[in-house]
């Protein structure tokens, strides 16, 4: 599968505002699954999952990776996510759609700050811990993720390989530090 899919089309982003659809993509990046297995993993009814899968397939966010005929001659279709990591280009989206992805950006910024202070023993980022500063960091990190993610769009990765995400975040943080968007 592709390492990164940059979501910059508001119609695609509109499909991904639903947290259940993002959960489906998360499971399908770990390994291919049938709809029955997905429904079981997510605790959804078959019709409910089918509704979400139709939306995801219509925008090519989920792909068929194989079909198998099992011993009872029933065709099993296995699906996978189109990419391992979906990066949201918030600047290319209308605010009414971008706002759904804001909590993810904010949580990323908080995680980066927290991990940085735990591992370095002090604040590695020279910012005030105010809502305004944390929001600015979240916006900066989102922009940098799009920029770094573009280098990974054509890279193929294996299911469940978290190394690529760690590498992307590392490059993003290093880029932020080197551009003085955050201080050491």
Predicted regions: what they are:
Residues 22-26:
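Pre-recognition alpha-helix immediately N-terminal to the DNA-recognition helix
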Residues 7-20, 34, 67-90:
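Short, cationic-aromatic polyanion-contact patches
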């Amino acid at each position: 599968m592709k390492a990164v899919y940059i979501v910059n089309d508001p119609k695609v982003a509109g499909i991904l505002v639903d947290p259940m659809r993002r959960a489906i993509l998360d499971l399908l990046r770990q390994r291919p699954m049938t709809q029955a297995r997905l429904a079981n993993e997510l605790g959804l009814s078959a019709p409910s999952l089918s509704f979400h899968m139709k939306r995801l397939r219509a925008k090519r966010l989920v792909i068929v990776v194989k079909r198998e005929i099992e011993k009872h001659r029933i065709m099993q279709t296995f699906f996978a996510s189109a990419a391992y990591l979906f990066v949201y280009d918030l600047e290319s989206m209308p605010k009414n759609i971008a706002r759904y992805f804001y909590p993810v950006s904010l949580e990323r910024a908080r995680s980066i700050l927290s991990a940085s202070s735990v591992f370095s023993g002090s604040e590695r980022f020279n910012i005030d811990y105010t809502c305004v500063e944390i929001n600015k960091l979240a916006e900066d990190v989102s922009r940098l993720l799009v920029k770094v993610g573009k280098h990974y769009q054509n890279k193929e990765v294996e299911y469940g390989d978290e190394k690529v995400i760690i590498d992307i975040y590392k490059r993003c943080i290093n880029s932020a530090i080197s551009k003085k968007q955050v201080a050491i």
